[in-house]
Regions:
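Intrinsically disordered, low-complexity polar regions and short flexible loop motifs
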Residues: 2-240
Length: 240
Protein backbone atom coordinates (compact mmCIF):
# COMPACT_ATOMS: atom_id res chain seq x y z
CA UNK A 1 0.00 0.00 0.00
CA UNK A 2 1.41 3.33 -1.07
CA UNK A 3 1.19 6.15 1.45
CA UNK A 4 -0.80 8.16 -1.10
CA UNK A 5 -3.61 5.61 -0.82
CA UNK A 6 -4.15 6.42 2.86
CA UNK A 7 -7.09 8.78 3.34
CA UNK A 8 -8.60 10.23 6.52
CA UNK A 9 -11.59 12.45 5.85
CA UNK A 10 -10.43 15.00 3.29
CA UNK A 11 -6.75 14.37 4.06
CA UNK A 12 -4.80 12.04 1.81
CA UNK A 13 -1.24 10.72 1.69
CA UNK A 14 1.33 12.50 3.84
CA UNK A 15 -1.28 14.96 5.12
CA UNK A 16 -3.31 11.98 6.36
CA UNK A 17 -0.20 10.53 8.06
CA UNK A 18 0.38 13.85 9.81
CA UNK A 19 -3.22 13.89 11.02
CA UNK A 20 -2.90 10.29 12.25
CA UNK A 21 0.23 11.17 14.21
CA UNK A 22 -1.61 13.96 16.01
CA UNK A 23 -4.59 11.65 16.56
CA UNK A 24 -2.25 9.21 18.31
CA UNK A 25 -0.74 11.98 20.42
CA UNK A 26 -4.21 13.15 21.49
CA UNK A 27 -5.24 9.59 22.38
CA UNK A 28 -2.06 9.13 24.39
CA UNK A 29 -2.78 12.30 26.39
CA UNK A 30 -6.38 11.21 27.04
CA UNK A 31 -5.29 7.76 28.24
CA UNK A 32 -2.54 9.30 30.37
CA UNK A 33 -5.10 11.59 32.04
CA UNK A 34 -7.49 8.68 32.62
CA UNK A 35 -4.72 6.66 34.29
CA UNK A 36 -3.91 9.65 36.51
CA UNK A 37 -7.59 9.84 37.44
CA UNK A 38 -7.52 6.18 38.52
CA UNK A 39 -4.49 6.91 40.71
CA UNK A 40 -6.43 9.69 42.47
CA UNK A 41 -9.53 7.60 43.24
CA UNK A 42 -10.05 6.55 46.85
CA UNK A 43 -12.86 3.97 46.99
CA UNK A 44 -15.15 3.63 49.98
CA UNK A 45 -13.50 1.69 52.80
CA UNK A 46 -16.77 -0.21 53.22
CA UNK A 47 -16.05 -2.14 50.04
CA UNK A 48 -12.97 -4.17 50.97
CA UNK A 49 -12.69 -5.88 47.58
CA UNK A 50 -12.79 -2.56 45.75
CA UNK A 51 -10.15 -1.11 48.08
CA UNK A 52 -7.98 -4.15 47.43
CA UNK A 53 -8.50 -3.82 43.66
CA UNK A 54 -7.48 -0.16 43.62
CA UNK A 55 -4.47 -0.79 45.85
CA UNK A 56 -3.33 -3.43 43.38
CA UNK A 57 -3.76 -1.09 40.41
CA UNK A 58 -2.01 1.80 42.16
CA UNK A 59 0.88 -0.42 43.18
CA UNK A 60 1.36 -1.49 39.56
CA UNK A 61 1.17 2.11 38.30
CA UNK A 62 3.58 3.36 40.97
CA UNK A 63 6.41 1.73 39.01
CA UNK A 64 7.32 4.25 36.25
CA UNK A 65 8.19 1.66 33.59
CA UNK A 66 4.95 -0.24 34.21
CA UNK A 67 2.91 2.92 33.88
CA UNK A 68 4.69 4.22 30.79
CA UNK A 69 4.57 0.90 28.92
CA UNK A 70 0.92 0.37 29.83
CA UNK A 71 -0.10 3.81 28.56
CA UNK A 72 1.82 3.26 25.32
CA UNK A 73 0.28 -0.16 24.70
CA UNK A 74 -3.27 0.91 25.52
CA UNK A 75 -3.20 4.21 23.65
CA UNK A 76 -1.74 2.63 20.50
CA UNK A 77 -4.20 -0.26 20.81
CA UNK A 78 -7.10 2.21 20.98
CA UNK A 79 -5.59 4.13 18.05
CA UNK A 80 -5.23 0.98 15.93
CA UNK A 81 -8.28 -1.11 16.85
CA UNK A 82 -10.69 1.31 18.53
CA UNK A 83 -11.64 1.81 22.15
CA UNK A 84 -14.22 -1.01 22.25
CA UNK A 85 -12.07 -3.59 20.48
CA UNK A 86 -8.74 -3.59 22.27
CA UNK A 87 -7.48 -4.90 25.60
CA UNK A 88 -3.82 -4.98 26.60
CA UNK A 89 -4.58 -8.44 27.99
CA UNK A 90 -7.56 -10.79 28.01
CA UNK A 91 -6.43 -12.32 31.30
CA UNK A 92 -8.94 -11.02 33.85
CA UNK A 93 -6.56 -11.93 36.68
CA UNK A 94 -3.94 -9.52 35.33
CA UNK A 95 -3.98 -6.11 37.04
CA UNK A 96 -3.59 -4.48 33.63
CA UNK A 97 -7.00 -5.84 32.65
CA UNK A 98 -8.60 -3.98 35.57
CA UNK A 99 -6.82 -0.74 34.67
CA UNK A 100 -7.83 -1.19 31.02
CA UNK A 101 -11.51 -1.66 31.96
CA UNK A 102 -11.47 1.41 34.21
CA UNK A 103 -9.78 3.60 31.59
CA UNK A 104 -12.39 2.56 29.02
CA UNK A 105 -15.17 3.35 31.50
CA UNK A 106 -13.73 6.82 32.13
CA UNK A 107 -13.61 7.51 28.38
CA UNK A 108 -17.24 6.43 28.01
CA UNK A 109 -18.39 8.56 30.96
CA UNK A 110 -16.50 11.56 29.59
CA UNK A 111 -18.08 10.98 26.17
CA UNK A 112 -14.71 11.05 24.45
CA UNK A 113 -14.86 11.72 20.71
CA UNK A 114 -15.95 8.57 18.87
CA UNK A 115 -14.20 9.66 15.68
CA UNK A 116 -10.89 10.05 17.53
CA UNK A 117 -11.17 6.49 18.82
CA UNK A 118 -12.33 4.85 15.60
CA UNK A 119 -10.21 1.87 14.35
CA UNK A 120 -7.31 2.60 12.00
CA UNK A 121 -6.02 -0.91 11.31
CA UNK A 122 -7.62 -0.84 7.86
CA UNK A 123 -5.63 2.32 7.11
CA UNK A 124 -2.27 1.36 8.57
CA UNK A 125 -2.16 -2.43 8.92
CA UNK A 126 -1.12 -3.20 5.35
CA UNK A 127 1.09 -0.11 5.19
CA UNK A 128 3.24 -1.21 8.14
CA UNK A 129 3.28 -4.87 7.06
CA UNK A 130 4.52 -3.93 3.58
CA UNK A 131 7.16 -1.61 5.03
CA UNK A 132 8.37 -4.30 7.44
CA UNK A 133 8.49 -6.98 4.75
CA UNK A 134 10.51 -4.69 2.48
CA UNK A 135 13.12 -3.89 5.13
CA UNK A 136 13.22 -7.48 6.37
CA UNK A 137 13.83 -8.70 2.81
CA UNK A 138 16.82 -6.37 2.55
CA UNK A 139 18.17 -7.49 5.93
CA UNK A 140 17.98 -11.18 5.00
CA UNK A 141 19.42 -10.92 1.49
CA UNK A 142 22.50 -13.16 1.62
CA UNK A 143 24.02 -11.85 -1.60
CA UNK A 144 24.45 -8.32 -0.25
CA UNK A 145 27.19 -6.91 1.96
CA UNK A 146 26.12 -4.93 5.03
CA UNK A 147 26.94 -1.58 3.44
CA UNK A 148 24.86 -2.54 0.39
CA UNK A 149 21.96 -3.53 2.62
CA UNK A 150 22.24 -0.22 4.42
CA UNK A 151 22.15 1.71 1.14
CA UNK A 152 19.00 -0.12 0.02
CA UNK A 153 17.36 0.50 3.39
CA UNK A 154 18.45 4.13 3.14
CA UNK A 155 16.48 4.41 -0.11
CA UNK A 156 13.41 3.11 1.72
CA UNK A 157 13.98 5.63 4.53
CA UNK A 158 14.30 8.45 1.99
CA UNK A 159 10.71 7.80 0.95
CA UNK A 160 9.42 8.24 4.50
CA UNK A 161 8.29 11.69 5.60
CA UNK A 162 9.11 13.05 9.07
CA UNK A 163 5.66 12.06 10.31
CA UNK A 164 5.93 8.58 8.79
CA UNK A 165 9.17 8.04 10.69
CA UNK A 166 7.60 9.36 13.90
CA UNK A 167 4.56 7.10 13.46
CA UNK A 168 6.87 4.14 12.75
CA UNK A 169 8.66 4.82 16.04
CA UNK A 170 5.44 4.83 18.05
CA UNK A 171 4.18 1.77 16.20
CA UNK A 172 7.36 -0.03 17.24
CA UNK A 173 6.62 0.63 20.92
CA UNK A 174 3.31 -1.21 20.63
CA UNK A 175 2.59 -4.93 20.79
CA UNK A 176 1.74 -4.80 17.07
CA UNK A 177 5.08 -3.28 16.05
CA UNK A 178 7.60 -4.61 18.58
CA UNK A 179 9.40 -6.70 15.92
CA UNK A 180 10.84 -3.41 14.64
CA UNK A 181 12.76 -2.92 17.91
CA UNK A 182 13.63 -6.51 18.79
CA UNK A 183 16.30 -6.90 20.09
CA UNK A 184 17.09 -3.62 21.88
CA UNK A 185 20.33 -2.49 23.53
CA UNK A 186 22.64 -4.39 21.15
CA UNK A 187 26.19 -3.12 20.51
CA UNK A 188 26.81 -5.06 17.27
CA UNK A 189 25.22 -3.02 14.47
CA UNK A 190 24.56 -6.08 12.28
CA UNK A 191 22.61 -7.69 15.12
CA UNK A 192 20.60 -4.60 16.08
CA UNK A 193 16.86 -4.32 15.57
CA UNK A 194 15.80 -3.13 12.11
CA UNK A 195 15.11 0.47 13.14
CA UNK A 196 18.55 0.82 14.73
CA UNK A 197 20.52 -1.28 12.24
CA UNK A 198 19.39 0.82 9.29
CA UNK A 199 18.68 4.06 11.19
CA UNK A 200 15.17 4.12 9.78
CA UNK A 201 14.08 7.06 11.93
CA UNK A 202 17.23 9.12 11.43
CA UNK A 203 15.31 12.12 10.14
CA UNK A 204 12.87 12.47 13.02
CA UNK A 205 12.83 16.23 13.75
CA UNK A 206 14.31 17.43 17.04
CA UNK A 207 11.56 20.04 17.39
CA UNK A 208 8.65 17.55 17.51
CA UNK A 209 6.75 17.37 20.78
CA UNK A 210 7.43 13.70 21.48
CA UNK A 211 5.21 12.08 24.07
CA UNK A 212 5.74 9.12 26.38
CA UNK A 213 8.98 7.22 25.85
CA UNK A 214 11.32 9.63 24.07
CA UNK A 215 13.21 8.18 21.07
CA UNK A 216 16.51 9.65 22.23
CA UNK A 217 16.19 7.81 25.54
CA UNK A 218 14.89 4.56 24.08
CA UNK A 219 17.79 4.16 21.64
CA UNK A 220 20.45 5.45 24.03
CA UNK A 221 22.75 2.43 23.60
CA UNK A 222 22.35 2.34 19.83
CA UNK A 223 23.07 6.08 19.59
CA UNK A 224 26.39 5.61 21.39
CA UNK A 225 27.35 2.63 19.21
CA UNK A 226 26.69 4.53 16.00
CA UNK A 227 28.71 7.49 17.29
CA UNK A 228 31.70 5.22 17.93
CA UNK A 229 31.43 4.16 14.28
CA UNK A 230 31.44 7.77 13.10
CA UNK A 231 27.73 8.06 12.44
CA UNK A 232 24.77 9.78 14.07
CA UNK A 233 21.71 7.75 14.97
CA UNK A 234 19.60 10.88 14.42
CA UNK A 235 20.41 13.60 11.91
CA UNK A 236 20.08 16.11 14.75
CA UNK A 237 20.47 14.45 18.14
CA UNK A 238 17.24 13.96 20.07
CA UNK A 239 18.54 14.61 23.57
CA UNK A 240 15.22 13.85 25.22
Amino acid sequence: QNVEEIQVGEKRGREAIELLFYNLRDIYMIVENAVSEIERINPSTDDKEEVKRFDRMKNFLSKPNNKLNFIHNLSYGYFFYGVQNYYVTKNKQDVQYDINVDVTAILVVNKTSKSLFSPRNSLLGHYFRHLYQTVQFIAREENLQEDEKYNYAKMVRAQLSDFEQALLYYNSLSVMGKKWITPIGIVDIKKMCLIARFRLIKNMPYYFEYFGIKPGDFFEVEKEVWQTHGGNFFEIDLIN
